[in-house]
Swiss-Prot record:
Protein name: (+)-3-carene synthase 1, chloroplastic
Function according to Swiss-Prot or TrEMBL: Monoterpene synthase (TPS) involved in the biosynthesis of monoterpene natural products included in conifer oleoresin secretions and volatile emissions; these compounds contribute to biotic and abiotic stress defense against herbivores and pathogens. Catalyzes the conversion of (2E)-geranyl diphosphate (GPP) to (+)-car-3-ene and, to a lower extent, to terpinolene.
Cofactor: Mg(2+); Mn(2+)
Metal-binding keyword on record: yes
Gene that encodes it: TPS-(+)3car1
Localization annotation: Plastid, Chloroplast
Alphabetical list of Pfam families matching this protein: Terpene_synth (PF01397), Terpene_synth_C (PF03936)
Gene Ontology MF annotations: magnesium ion binding; terpene synthase activity
Amino acid sequence: MSLISAVPLASSCVSKSLISSVREHTALRRAIATLQMSRRGKSVAASIRMSSATAGSDDGVKRRIGDYHSNLWDDNFIQSLSSPYGASSYGEHADRLIGEVKEIFNSFSIADGELISPVNDLLQQLWMVDNVERLGIDRHFQTEIKVALDYVYRYWSEEGIGCGRDSAFTDLNTTALAFRIFRLHGYTVSSDVFEHFKDQKGQFAASANDTELQTRSVFNLFRASLIAFPEEKVLEEAEKFAAAYLKAALQTLPVSGLSREIQYVFDYRWHSNLPRLEARSYIDILADNTISGTPDANTKKLLELAKLEFNIFHSVQQKELQCLWRWWKEWGCPELTFIRHRYVEFYTLVSGIDMVPEHATFRLSCVKTCHLITILDDMYDTFGTIDELRLFTAAVKRWDPSATECLPEYMKGVYMVLYETVNEMAKEAQKSQRRDTLGYVRQALEDYIGSYLKEAQWIATGYVPTFQEYFENGKLSSGHRIATLQPILTLSIPFPHHILQEIDFPSKFNDYAASILRLRGDTRCYKADSARGEEASCISCYMKDNPGSTQEDALNHINGMIEDMIKKLNWEFLRPDNNAPISSKKHAFNISRGLHHFYNYRDGYSVASKETKDLVIKTVLEPVLM
Protein backbone atom coordinates (compact mmCIF):
# COMPACT_ATOMS: atom_id res chain seq x y z
CA MET A 1 0.00 0.00 0.00
CA SER A 2 1.34 3.42 -0.89
CA LEU A 3 0.65 6.75 0.72
CA ILE A 4 -1.58 7.54 -2.23
CA SER A 5 -4.22 5.23 -0.83
CA ALA A 6 -3.52 6.11 2.79
CA VAL A 7 -3.62 9.89 2.29
CA PRO A 8 -5.50 10.98 -0.84
CA LEU A 9 -3.87 13.59 -3.02
CA ALA A 10 -7.06 15.58 -3.37
CA SER A 11 -8.40 18.01 -0.85
CA SER A 12 -10.41 15.40 1.07
CA CYS A 13 -7.50 14.94 3.45
CA VAL A 14 -7.71 18.61 4.43
CA SER A 15 -11.47 18.91 4.66
CA LYS A 16 -11.75 17.08 8.00
CA SER A 17 -12.60 19.11 11.05
CA LEU A 18 -9.69 20.82 12.71
CA ILE A 19 -8.29 19.70 16.03
CA SER A 20 -10.45 21.29 18.67
CA SER A 21 -7.63 22.54 20.87
CA VAL A 22 -6.55 26.11 20.14
CA ARG A 23 -2.93 27.20 20.27
CA GLU A 24 -2.76 30.79 21.38
CA HIS A 25 -0.62 33.17 19.35
CA THR A 26 1.97 33.71 22.08
CA ALA A 27 2.27 30.01 22.77
CA LEU A 28 2.87 29.33 19.09
CA ARG A 29 5.65 31.88 18.99
CA ARG A 30 7.30 30.21 21.99
CA ALA A 31 6.99 26.82 20.32
CA ILE A 32 8.55 28.15 17.15
CA ALA A 33 11.37 29.80 19.08
CA THR A 34 12.22 26.54 20.86
CA LEU A 35 11.65 24.30 17.85
CA GLN A 36 14.17 21.48 17.76
CA MET A 37 15.93 21.56 14.42
CA SER A 38 16.42 17.81 14.10
CA ARG A 39 14.77 14.68 12.79
CA ARG A 40 13.47 12.09 15.23
CA GLY A 41 12.79 8.45 14.67
CA LYS A 42 12.69 6.47 11.45
CA SER A 43 10.05 5.84 8.84
CA VAL A 44 9.25 2.79 6.77
CA ALA A 45 7.43 3.01 3.46
CA ALA A 46 4.39 0.77 3.25
CA SER A 47 5.70 -0.78 0.04
CA ILE A 48 9.49 -0.40 -0.06
CA ARG A 49 11.69 0.68 2.82
CA MET A 50 14.27 3.32 1.99
CA SER A 51 16.85 3.20 4.75
CA SER A 52 20.36 4.44 5.23
CA ALA A 53 21.44 0.81 5.22
CA THR A 54 20.12 0.27 1.71
CA ALA A 55 21.08 3.71 0.46
CA GLY A 56 24.53 2.52 -0.41
CA SER A 57 26.39 4.33 2.36
CA ASP A 58 28.17 1.12 3.41
CA ASP A 59 28.18 -0.83 0.14
CA GLY A 60 31.84 -0.21 -0.58
CA VAL A 61 31.08 2.06 -3.54
CA LYS A 62 32.85 5.41 -3.57
CA ARG A 63 30.13 8.05 -3.65
CA ARG A 64 29.96 11.82 -3.51
CA ILE A 65 27.76 13.27 -0.78
CA GLY A 66 26.06 16.67 -0.91
CA ASP A 67 26.44 17.07 2.87
CA TYR A 68 23.14 18.93 3.22
CA HIS A 69 21.72 19.76 6.62
CA SER A 70 18.82 17.64 7.84
CA ASN A 71 15.14 18.54 7.93
CA LEU A 72 14.68 21.60 10.14
CA TRP A 73 11.12 20.92 11.23
CA ASP A 74 10.44 18.48 14.05
CA ASP A 75 7.87 15.78 13.27
CA ASN A 76 6.00 16.22 16.53
CA PHE A 77 5.77 19.95 15.99
CA ILE A 78 4.29 19.55 12.51
CA GLN A 79 1.71 17.07 13.77
CA SER A 80 0.77 19.30 16.71
CA LEU A 81 -0.19 22.27 14.53
CA SER A 82 -3.79 23.34 14.92
CA SER A 83 -5.93 26.39 14.29
CA PRO A 84 -9.46 27.43 15.22
CA TYR A 85 -9.98 29.32 11.96
CA GLY A 86 -11.30 26.31 10.06
CA ALA A 87 -14.59 26.59 11.92
CA SER A 88 -17.58 27.53 9.78
CA SER A 89 -18.30 30.63 11.88
CA TYR A 90 -15.12 32.27 10.59
CA GLY A 91 -16.08 31.53 7.01
CA GLU A 92 -19.50 33.07 7.60
CA HIS A 93 -17.90 36.17 9.10
CA ALA A 94 -15.59 36.43 6.08
CA ASP A 95 -18.59 36.23 3.75
CA ARG A 96 -20.22 39.15 5.56
CA LEU A 97 -17.04 41.21 5.29
CA ILE A 98 -16.73 40.38 1.60
CA GLY A 99 -20.20 41.80 1.11
CA GLU A 100 -19.23 44.96 2.98
CA VAL A 101 -16.09 45.44 0.88
CA LYS A 102 -18.18 45.02 -2.25
CA GLU A 103 -20.32 47.84 -0.93
CA ILE A 104 -17.19 49.98 -0.67
CA PHE A 105 -16.48 49.31 -4.34
CA ASN A 106 -20.09 50.17 -5.11
CA SER A 107 -19.93 53.34 -3.01
CA PHE A 108 -18.04 54.84 -5.91
CA SER A 109 -21.43 54.42 -7.53
CA ILE A 110 -22.35 55.66 -10.94
CA ALA A 111 -25.08 58.30 -11.18
CA ASP A 112 -26.26 59.31 -14.62
CA GLY A 113 -23.33 57.47 -16.13
CA GLU A 114 -20.69 59.22 -14.03
CA LEU A 115 -19.14 58.68 -10.63
CA ILE A 116 -20.41 61.08 -7.99
CA SER A 117 -17.01 62.53 -7.03
CA PRO A 118 -15.08 63.97 -10.01
CA VAL A 119 -12.05 65.08 -7.98
CA ASN A 120 -10.28 61.81 -7.13
CA ASP A 121 -12.65 59.11 -8.34
CA LEU A 122 -10.04 57.49 -10.60
CA LEU A 123 -7.39 57.30 -7.89
CA GLN A 124 -9.92 55.94 -5.39
CA GLN A 125 -10.85 53.09 -7.72
CA LEU A 126 -7.20 52.28 -8.41
CA TRP A 127 -6.41 52.44 -4.70
CA MET A 128 -9.11 49.88 -3.96
CA VAL A 129 -7.91 47.51 -6.68
CA ASP A 130 -4.27 47.85 -5.63
CA ASN A 131 -5.08 47.24 -1.98
CA VAL A 132 -7.24 44.14 -2.37
CA GLU A 133 -4.52 42.66 -4.60
CA ARG A 134 -1.67 43.43 -2.23
CA LEU A 135 -3.69 42.09 0.71
CA GLY A 136 -4.31 38.81 -1.12
CA ILE A 137 -8.11 39.06 -1.15
CA ASP A 138 -8.70 40.10 -4.78
CA ARG A 139 -10.15 36.72 -5.81
CA HIS A 140 -13.40 37.72 -4.09
CA PHE A 141 -13.81 40.91 -6.13
CA GLN A 142 -13.08 40.04 -9.75
CA THR A 143 -16.36 41.52 -11.01
CA GLU A 144 -15.88 44.73 -9.02
CA ILE A 145 -12.28 45.04 -10.19
CA LYS A 146 -13.33 44.64 -13.83
CA VAL A 147 -16.02 47.32 -13.47
CA ALA A 148 -13.59 49.71 -11.78
CA LEU A 149 -10.82 49.23 -14.33
CA ASP A 150 -13.14 49.51 -17.31
CA TYR A 151 -14.32 52.83 -15.93
CA VAL A 152 -10.83 54.22 -15.25
CA TYR A 153 -9.56 53.01 -18.63
CA ARG A 154 -12.12 55.26 -20.33
CA TYR A 155 -10.05 58.23 -19.15
CA TRP A 156 -6.64 56.81 -20.05
CA SER A 157 -4.77 58.89 -22.63
CA GLU A 158 -1.37 59.02 -24.31
CA GLU A 159 -0.32 61.51 -21.65
CA GLY A 160 -1.53 59.43 -18.72
CA ILE A 161 -4.31 60.08 -16.27
CA GLY A 162 -5.20 62.38 -13.39
CA CYS A 163 -6.68 61.72 -9.95
CA GLY A 164 -10.21 62.36 -11.13
CA ARG A 165 -12.18 62.47 -14.33
CA ASP A 166 -12.27 66.28 -14.14
CA SER A 167 -8.55 66.66 -13.45
CA ALA A 168 -6.98 69.34 -15.64
CA PHE A 169 -3.58 67.64 -15.55
CA THR A 170 -2.23 64.13 -15.47
CA ASP A 171 -0.08 63.14 -12.52
CA LEU A 172 2.71 60.61 -12.15
CA ASN A 173 1.31 58.80 -9.13
CA THR A 174 -2.06 57.95 -10.67
CA THR A 175 -0.55 57.27 -14.09
CA ALA A 176 2.10 54.87 -12.77
CA LEU A 177 -0.41 53.05 -10.56
CA ALA A 178 -2.89 52.76 -13.42
CA PHE A 179 -0.23 51.63 -15.91
CA ARG A 180 0.90 48.79 -13.69
CA ILE A 181 -2.62 47.58 -12.89
CA PHE A 182 -3.80 47.87 -16.49
CA ARG A 183 -0.82 45.92 -17.82
CA LEU A 184 -1.27 43.16 -15.26
CA HIS A 185 -4.95 42.86 -16.21
CA GLY A 186 -4.38 42.68 -19.96
CA TYR A 187 -5.35 46.22 -20.97
CA THR A 188 -3.34 47.78 -23.77
CA VAL A 189 -1.11 50.56 -22.42
CA SER A 190 2.09 52.00 -23.88
CA SER A 191 5.14 52.79 -21.77
CA ASP A 192 5.59 55.89 -23.93
CA VAL A 193 3.15 57.55 -21.53
CA PHE A 194 6.07 58.13 -19.16
CA GLU A 195 7.89 60.29 -21.70
CA HIS A 196 5.48 63.04 -20.67
CA PHE A 197 6.90 63.04 -17.15
CA LYS A 198 10.48 63.86 -18.17
CA ASP A 199 12.03 67.30 -17.94
CA GLN A 200 13.22 69.46 -20.82
CA LYS A 201 16.48 67.51 -20.91
CA GLY A 202 14.58 64.29 -21.49
CA GLN A 203 15.31 62.93 -18.04
CA PHE A 204 13.20 61.91 -15.08
CA ALA A 205 13.61 64.43 -12.30
CA ALA A 206 12.10 65.16 -8.92
CA SER A 207 11.27 68.54 -7.49
CA ALA A 208 13.51 70.08 -4.86
CA ASN A 209 10.80 69.79 -2.21
CA ASP A 210 10.51 66.15 -1.24
CA THR A 211 7.03 65.21 -0.09
CA GLU A 212 5.39 61.93 0.78
CA LEU A 213 3.22 62.26 -2.33
CA GLN A 214 6.29 62.69 -4.51
CA THR A 215 8.00 59.72 -2.89
CA ARG A 216 4.89 57.60 -3.37
CA SER A 217 4.70 58.72 -7.00
CA VAL A 218 8.29 57.56 -7.59
CA PHE A 219 7.53 54.36 -5.68
CA ASN A 220 4.65 53.56 -8.04
CA LEU A 221 6.87 54.46 -11.00
CA PHE A 222 9.40 51.91 -9.73
CA ARG A 223 6.71 49.25 -9.35
CA ALA A 224 5.54 49.96 -12.91
CA SER A 225 9.09 49.66 -14.26
CA LEU A 226 9.40 46.10 -12.93
CA ILE A 227 6.89 44.76 -15.46
CA ALA A 228 8.77 46.15 -18.44
CA PHE A 229 8.71 44.44 -21.82
CA PRO A 230 11.79 44.10 -24.08
CA GLU A 231 13.06 47.31 -25.68
CA GLU A 232 11.06 49.59 -23.39
CA LYS A 233 13.90 52.03 -22.85
CA VAL A 234 11.76 54.54 -21.00
CA LEU A 235 10.99 51.94 -18.31
CA GLU A 236 14.68 51.07 -18.02
CA GLU A 237 15.37 54.76 -17.43
CA ALA A 238 12.46 54.94 -15.00
CA GLU A 239 13.78 52.00 -12.99
CA LYS A 240 17.26 53.50 -12.65
CA PHE A 241 15.90 56.90 -11.66
CA ALA A 242 13.32 55.53 -9.23
CA ALA A 243 15.73 53.08 -7.59
CA ALA A 244 18.30 55.81 -6.96
CA TYR A 245 15.67 58.23 -5.66
CA LEU A 246 14.06 55.69 -3.34
CA LYS A 247 17.37 54.44 -1.94
CA ALA A 248 18.23 58.02 -1.04
CA ALA A 249 14.75 58.54 0.41
CA LEU A 250 15.14 55.53 2.70
CA GLN A 251 18.10 57.27 4.31
CA THR A 252 15.95 60.20 5.40
CA LEU A 253 12.43 58.80 5.74
CA PRO A 254 11.31 57.84 9.23
CA VAL A 255 10.32 54.22 9.72
CA SER A 256 6.80 54.33 8.35
CA GLY A 257 4.36 52.45 6.20
CA LEU A 258 5.78 54.02 3.06
CA SER A 259 9.40 53.24 3.92
CA ARG A 260 8.46 49.64 4.67
CA GLU A 261 6.59 49.36 1.38
CA ILE A 262 9.67 50.63 -0.45
CA GLN A 263 11.99 48.23 1.36
CA TYR A 264 9.71 45.28 0.60
CA VAL A 265 9.71 45.98 -3.14
CA PHE A 266 13.50 46.34 -3.08
CA ASP A 267 13.80 43.01 -1.28
CA TYR A 268 11.28 41.12 -3.43
CA ARG A 269 10.93 42.36 -6.96
CA TRP A 270 7.88 41.33 -8.90
CA HIS A 271 9.39 38.28 -10.61
CA SER A 272 10.38 36.70 -7.27
CA ASN A 273 7.58 38.00 -5.07
CA LEU A 274 5.27 35.65 -3.18
CA PRO A 275 1.71 37.03 -2.93
CA ARG A 276 1.18 35.57 0.55
CA LEU A 277 4.39 37.11 1.87
CA GLU A 278 3.34 40.43 0.36
CA ALA A 279 -0.08 40.09 1.98
CA ARG A 280 1.51 39.40 5.38
CA SER A 281 3.83 42.38 4.99
CA TYR A 282 1.07 44.74 3.86
CA ILE A 283 -1.28 43.57 6.62
CA ASP A 284 1.41 44.46 9.14
CA ILE A 285 1.91 47.87 7.52
CA LEU A 286 -1.78 48.74 7.49
CA ALA A 287 -2.19 47.41 11.01
CA ASP A 288 0.34 49.96 12.19
CA ASN A 289 -1.86 52.64 10.65
CA THR A 290 1.09 54.60 9.30
CA ILE A 291 -0.06 55.20 5.75
CA SER A 292 -1.51 58.68 5.41
CA GLY A 293 -4.08 59.90 2.94
CA THR A 294 -6.13 56.67 2.79
CA PRO A 295 -9.83 56.43 3.71
CA ASP A 296 -9.59 55.22 7.30
CA ALA A 297 -12.93 53.42 7.46
CA ASN A 298 -12.27 51.61 4.19
CA THR A 299 -8.76 50.66 5.27
CA LYS A 300 -10.06 49.16 8.51
CA LYS A 301 -12.64 47.09 6.67
CA LEU A 302 -10.08 45.81 4.15
CA LEU A 303 -7.66 45.03 6.94
CA GLU A 304 -10.24 43.11 8.96
CA LEU A 305 -11.11 40.93 5.97
CA ALA A 306 -7.46 40.43 4.99
CA LYS A 307 -6.53 39.26 8.48
CA LEU A 308 -9.45 36.86 8.64
CA GLU A 309 -8.76 35.44 5.18
CA PHE A 310 -5.07 35.05 6.06
CA ASN A 311 -5.91 33.04 9.16
CA ILE A 312 -8.61 30.93 7.50
CA PHE A 313 -6.09 29.87 4.88
CA HIS A 314 -3.56 29.35 7.67
CA SER A 315 -5.81 26.57 8.99
CA VAL A 316 -5.88 25.02 5.50
CA GLN A 317 -2.09 25.20 5.29
CA GLN A 318 -1.62 23.30 8.53
CA LYS A 319 -3.81 20.39 7.42
CA GLU A 320 -2.14 20.24 4.00
CA LEU A 321 1.30 20.32 5.58
CA GLN A 322 0.34 17.39 7.79
CA CYS A 323 -0.87 15.49 4.70
CA LEU A 324 2.49 16.08 3.06
CA TRP A 325 4.30 14.96 6.21
CA ARG A 326 2.43 11.64 6.11
CA TRP A 327 3.29 11.17 2.43
CA TRP A 328 6.93 11.99 3.12
CA LYS A 329 7.08 9.58 6.07
CA GLU A 330 5.08 6.72 4.51
CA TRP A 331 7.46 6.56 1.58
CA GLY A 332 10.48 6.56 3.89
CA CYS A 333 11.91 9.76 2.45
CA PRO A 334 13.59 10.72 5.76
CA GLU A 335 15.80 7.63 5.40
CA LEU A 336 17.32 8.85 2.16
CA THR A 337 20.19 10.50 3.94
CA PHE A 338 21.83 11.85 0.78
CA ILE A 339 18.95 14.15 -0.24
CA ARG A 340 17.72 17.55 0.87
CA HIS A 341 14.58 17.22 3.01
CA ARG A 342 12.68 20.39 2.20
CA TYR A 343 8.99 19.51 1.90
CA VAL A 344 8.08 22.24 4.41
CA GLU A 345 10.03 24.88 2.49
CA PHE A 346 8.51 23.76 -0.80
CA TYR A 347 5.03 23.89 0.66
CA THR A 348 5.71 27.39 1.94
CA LEU A 349 6.55 28.55 -1.57
CA VAL A 350 3.60 26.84 -3.21
CA SER A 351 1.07 28.07 -0.66
CA GLY A 352 2.70 31.46 -1.04
CA ILE A 353 1.67 31.68 -4.70
CA ASP A 354 -1.80 30.10 -4.45
CA MET A 355 -4.07 30.96 -1.55
CA VAL A 356 -7.33 29.54 -2.90
CA PRO A 357 -8.48 26.94 -0.34
CA GLU A 358 -10.12 24.82 -3.05
CA HIS A 359 -6.78 24.37 -4.86
CA ALA A 360 -5.43 21.76 -2.43
CA THR A 361 -4.80 19.25 -5.21
CA PHE A 362 -2.67 21.76 -7.10
CA ARG A 363 -0.60 22.66 -4.05
CA LEU A 364 -0.03 19.07 -2.94
CA SER A 365 0.84 18.02 -6.50
CA CYS A 366 3.30 20.86 -6.85
CA VAL A 367 5.08 20.12 -3.56
CA LYS A 368 5.29 16.39 -4.25
CA THR A 369 6.64 17.04 -7.74
CA CYS A 370 9.27 19.43 -6.40
CA HIS A 371 10.31 16.95 -3.71
CA LEU A 372 10.63 14.19 -6.32
CA ILE A 373 12.76 16.53 -8.41
CA THR A 374 14.99 17.07 -5.40
CA ILE A 375 15.45 13.34 -4.84
CA LEU A 376 16.37 12.85 -8.50
CA ASP A 377 18.63 15.90 -8.50
CA ASP A 378 20.63 14.71 -5.50
CA MET A 379 20.77 11.14 -6.78
CA TYR A 380 22.02 12.13 -10.23
CA ASP A 381 24.25 14.99 -9.12
CA THR A 382 26.03 13.32 -6.23
CA PHE A 383 25.07 9.90 -4.89
CA GLY A 384 24.46 7.62 -7.86
CA THR A 385 27.24 6.04 -9.90
CA ILE A 386 27.09 6.51 -13.65
CA ASP A 387 26.22 2.83 -14.20
CA GLU A 388 23.41 2.98 -11.63
CA LEU A 389 22.05 6.15 -13.19
CA ARG A 390 21.96 4.58 -16.64
CA LEU A 391 19.92 1.71 -15.20
CA PHE A 392 17.53 4.12 -13.50
CA THR A 393 17.11 6.18 -16.67
CA ALA A 394 16.23 3.05 -18.64
CA ALA A 395 13.78 1.97 -15.92
CA VAL A 396 11.95 5.30 -16.11
CA LYS A 397 11.53 4.83 -19.85
CA ARG A 398 10.00 1.38 -19.24
CA TRP A 399 7.59 2.81 -16.63
CA ASP A 400 6.78 -0.51 -15.03
CA PRO A 401 7.32 -1.66 -11.42
CA SER A 402 9.10 -4.76 -12.72
CA ALA A 403 11.86 -2.43 -13.92
CA THR A 404 13.05 -2.17 -10.30
CA GLU A 405 14.47 -5.70 -10.49
CA CYS A 406 17.67 -4.43 -12.08
CA LEU A 407 18.10 -1.46 -9.73
CA PRO A 408 20.20 -1.12 -6.57
CA GLU A 409 18.15 -1.34 -3.38
CA TYR A 410 18.14 2.39 -2.62
CA MET A 411 16.94 3.16 -6.15
CA LYS A 412 13.99 0.79 -5.89
CA GLY A 413 12.29 2.97 -3.32
CA VAL A 414 13.06 6.11 -5.31
CA TYR A 415 11.60 4.54 -8.43
CA MET A 416 8.40 3.42 -6.72
CA VAL A 417 7.63 6.75 -5.05
CA LEU A 418 8.20 8.40 -8.43
CA TYR A 419 6.07 5.86 -10.29
CA GLU A 420 3.16 5.83 -7.83
CA THR A 421 3.04 9.58 -7.24
CA VAL A 422 3.23 10.56 -10.91
CA ASN A 423 0.53 8.03 -11.82
CA GLU A 424 -1.74 9.27 -9.04
CA MET A 425 -1.28 12.89 -10.11
CA ALA A 426 -2.08 11.86 -13.68
CA LYS A 427 -5.38 10.41 -12.44
CA GLU A 428 -6.18 13.71 -10.75
CA ALA A 429 -5.27 15.56 -13.95
CA GLN A 430 -7.55 13.29 -15.97
CA LYS A 431 -10.48 14.32 -13.77
CA SER A 432 -9.77 17.99 -14.46
CA GLN A 433 -8.72 17.84 -18.11
CA ARG A 434 -11.04 14.97 -19.15
CA ARG A 435 -8.25 13.31 -21.06
CA ASP A 436 -5.26 11.11 -20.24
CA THR A 437 -2.18 13.29 -19.70
CA LEU A 438 0.18 10.60 -18.39
CA GLY A 439 1.96 10.11 -21.73
CA TYR A 440 2.54 13.84 -21.98
CA VAL A 441 3.99 14.01 -18.47
CA ARG A 442 6.09 10.87 -18.94
CA GLN A 443 7.75 12.39 -22.00
CA ALA A 444 8.57 15.52 -20.00
CA LEU A 445 9.96 13.33 -17.20
CA GLU A 446 12.12 11.33 -19.62
CA ASP A 447 13.53 14.52 -21.12
CA TYR A 448 14.24 15.82 -17.64
CA ILE A 449 16.02 12.67 -16.46
CA GLY A 450 17.90 12.48 -19.75
CA SER A 451 19.32 15.93 -19.11
CA TYR A 452 20.39 14.79 -15.64
CA LEU A 453 22.16 11.76 -17.07
CA LYS A 454 24.07 13.97 -19.48
CA GLU A 455 25.26 16.15 -16.59
CA ALA A 456 26.21 13.05 -14.60
CA GLN A 457 28.31 11.89 -17.55
CA TRP A 458 30.04 15.27 -17.62
CA ILE A 459 30.84 14.94 -13.91
CA ALA A 460 32.09 11.36 -14.34
CA THR A 461 34.44 12.32 -17.17
CA GLY A 462 35.43 15.78 -15.93
CA TYR A 463 34.07 17.32 -19.13
CA VAL A 464 33.29 21.05 -19.13
CA PRO A 465 30.94 21.83 -22.04
CA THR A 466 30.62 25.07 -23.95
CA PHE A 467 28.31 27.66 -22.47
CA GLN A 468 25.64 27.07 -25.10
CA GLU A 469 25.78 23.28 -24.70
CA TYR A 470 25.50 23.59 -20.94
CA PHE A 471 22.77 26.22 -21.12
CA GLU A 472 20.51 24.27 -23.50
CA ASN A 473 20.74 21.13 -21.38
CA GLY A 474 20.45 23.18 -18.19
CA LYS A 475 17.06 24.54 -19.17
CA LEU A 476 15.76 20.97 -19.00
CA SER A 477 17.69 19.96 -15.87
CA SER A 478 16.48 23.07 -14.02
CA GLY A 479 13.27 21.10 -13.45
CA HIS A 480 11.06 24.04 -14.31
CA ARG A 481 9.03 22.20 -16.92
CA ILE A 482 8.24 19.14 -14.86
CA ALA A 483 7.60 21.25 -11.73
CA THR A 484 5.03 23.26 -13.67
CA LEU A 485 3.37 20.84 -16.08
CA GLN A 486 2.00 18.15 -13.78
CA PRO A 487 0.56 20.49 -11.11
CA ILE A 488 -1.23 22.89 -13.46
CA LEU A 489 -2.98 19.97 -15.15
CA THR A 490 -4.69 19.15 -11.84
CA LEU A 491 -6.41 22.55 -11.79
CA SER A 492 -10.03 22.88 -12.81
CA ILE A 493 -8.86 25.33 -15.49
CA PRO A 494 -9.03 23.61 -18.90
CA PHE A 495 -5.74 23.37 -20.77
CA PRO A 496 -6.56 22.33 -24.33
CA HIS A 497 -3.63 21.61 -26.60
CA HIS A 498 -3.47 25.08 -28.17
CA ILE A 499 -3.22 26.75 -24.74
CA LEU A 500 -0.74 24.21 -23.38
CA GLN A 501 1.46 24.94 -26.41
CA GLU A 502 1.76 28.54 -25.20
CA ILE A 503 2.91 27.48 -21.72
CA ASP A 504 4.77 24.19 -21.97
CA PHE A 505 7.91 23.17 -23.88
CA PRO A 506 8.96 24.30 -26.44
CA SER A 507 7.07 27.58 -25.97
CA LYS A 508 8.98 30.80 -25.38
CA PHE A 509 7.17 31.14 -22.06
CA ASN A 510 8.65 27.86 -20.81
CA ASP A 511 12.03 28.59 -22.37
CA TYR A 512 12.47 31.96 -20.64
CA ALA A 513 11.18 30.74 -17.27
CA ALA A 514 13.50 27.72 -17.32
CA SER A 515 16.41 29.86 -18.51
CA ILE A 516 16.03 32.32 -15.66
CA LEU A 517 15.81 29.50 -13.12
CA ARG A 518 18.92 27.78 -14.47
CA LEU A 519 21.00 30.96 -14.69
CA ARG A 520 19.89 32.38 -11.35
CA GLY A 521 20.35 29.05 -9.63
CA ASP A 522 23.88 28.72 -10.98
CA THR A 523 24.88 32.20 -9.84
CA ARG A 524 23.84 31.24 -6.31
CA CYS A 525 25.12 27.64 -6.23
CA TYR A 526 28.24 27.42 -8.41
CA LYS A 527 30.76 27.59 -5.56
CA ALA A 528 29.07 24.86 -3.52
CA ASP A 529 28.54 22.73 -6.64
CA SER A 530 32.21 23.04 -7.58
CA ALA A 531 33.23 21.96 -4.08
CA ARG A 532 31.20 18.76 -4.63
CA GLY A 533 33.00 18.04 -7.89
CA GLU A 534 30.40 19.51 -10.26
CA GLU A 535 32.67 21.60 -12.45
CA ALA A 536 30.14 22.50 -15.14
CA SER A 537 28.12 25.63 -14.42
CA CYS A 538 27.14 28.63 -16.47
CA ILE A 539 30.00 30.51 -14.78
CA SER A 540 32.73 27.96 -15.51
CA CYS A 541 31.45 27.35 -19.05
CA TYR A 542 31.43 31.07 -19.82
CA MET A 543 34.99 31.40 -18.53
CA LYS A 544 36.06 28.43 -20.65
CA ASP A 545 34.53 30.03 -23.75
CA ASN A 546 36.15 33.38 -22.92
CA PRO A 547 39.78 32.80 -21.87
CA GLY A 548 41.05 35.49 -19.54
CA SER A 549 37.60 36.32 -18.18
CA THR A 550 37.00 36.33 -14.44
CA GLN A 551 34.15 35.06 -12.30
CA GLU A 552 33.00 38.65 -11.98
CA ASP A 553 32.92 38.98 -15.78
CA ALA A 554 30.87 35.80 -16.03
CA LEU A 555 28.43 36.91 -13.33
CA ASN A 556 27.95 40.32 -14.94
CA HIS A 557 27.24 38.70 -18.30
CA ILE A 558 24.81 36.17 -16.83
CA ASN A 559 22.99 38.74 -14.69
CA GLY A 560 22.52 40.80 -17.85
CA MET A 561 21.02 37.74 -19.56
CA ILE A 562 18.66 37.25 -16.63
CA GLU A 563 17.42 40.85 -16.75
CA ASP A 564 16.75 40.56 -20.48
CA MET A 565 14.91 37.27 -20.05
CA ILE A 566 12.76 38.63 -17.24
CA LYS A 567 11.46 41.26 -19.67
CA LYS A 568 10.86 38.61 -22.32
CA LEU A 569 9.01 36.43 -19.81
CA ASN A 570 6.91 39.44 -18.80
CA TRP A 571 5.94 39.84 -22.45
CA GLU A 572 5.06 36.18 -22.92
CA PHE A 573 2.95 36.25 -19.77
CA LEU A 574 1.15 39.55 -20.33
CA ARG A 575 1.10 39.98 -24.10
CA PRO A 576 -2.44 40.88 -25.21
CA ASP A 577 -2.25 39.02 -28.54
CA ASN A 578 -1.50 35.57 -27.09
CA ASN A 579 -3.72 32.54 -27.68
CA ALA A 580 -3.56 31.70 -23.98
CA PRO A 581 -5.29 34.16 -21.64
CA ILE A 582 -3.40 35.54 -18.65
CA SER A 583 -5.61 33.49 -16.32
CA SER A 584 -4.37 30.26 -17.95
CA LYS A 585 -0.72 31.28 -17.64
CA LYS A 586 -0.95 32.71 -14.14
CA HIS A 587 -0.25 29.52 -12.20
CA ALA A 588 2.68 28.56 -14.40
CA PHE A 589 4.09 32.06 -14.03
CA ASN A 590 3.59 32.01 -10.28
CA ILE A 591 5.39 28.67 -9.95
CA SER A 592 8.28 30.38 -11.72
CA ARG A 593 8.12 33.24 -9.21
CA GLY A 594 8.12 30.80 -6.32
CA LEU A 595 11.16 28.91 -7.59
CA HIS A 596 13.01 32.16 -8.25
CA HIS A 597 12.24 33.29 -4.71
CA PHE A 598 14.49 30.52 -3.39
CA TYR A 599 17.43 32.13 -5.17
CA ASN A 600 16.61 35.74 -4.38
CA TYR A 601 19.93 36.40 -2.65
CA ARG A 602 21.45 32.97 -2.10
CA ASP A 603 20.59 29.29 -2.40
CA GLY A 604 17.88 29.43 0.23
CA TYR A 605 16.86 25.88 -0.62
CA SER A 606 19.99 23.78 -0.17
CA VAL A 607 20.85 25.82 2.91
CA ALA A 608 17.68 26.98 4.61
CA SER A 609 18.82 30.41 5.72
CA LYS A 610 17.30 32.63 8.38
CA GLU A 611 15.26 34.29 5.61
CA THR A 612 13.85 30.91 4.57
CA LYS A 613 12.94 29.96 8.13
CA ASP A 614 11.38 33.37 8.72
CA LEU A 615 9.33 32.89 5.54
CA VAL A 616 7.97 29.57 6.84
CA ILE A 617 7.07 31.10 10.18
CA LYS A 618 5.44 34.25 8.80
CA THR A 619 3.38 32.66 6.05
CA VAL A 620 2.62 29.10 7.25
CA LEU A 621 3.18 28.58 10.97
CA GLU A 622 2.15 31.89 12.48
CA PRO A 623 -1.31 33.50 12.20
CA VAL A 624 -1.79 37.25 12.26
CA LEU A 625 -3.21 38.95 15.30
CA MET A 626 -6.83 39.90 14.74
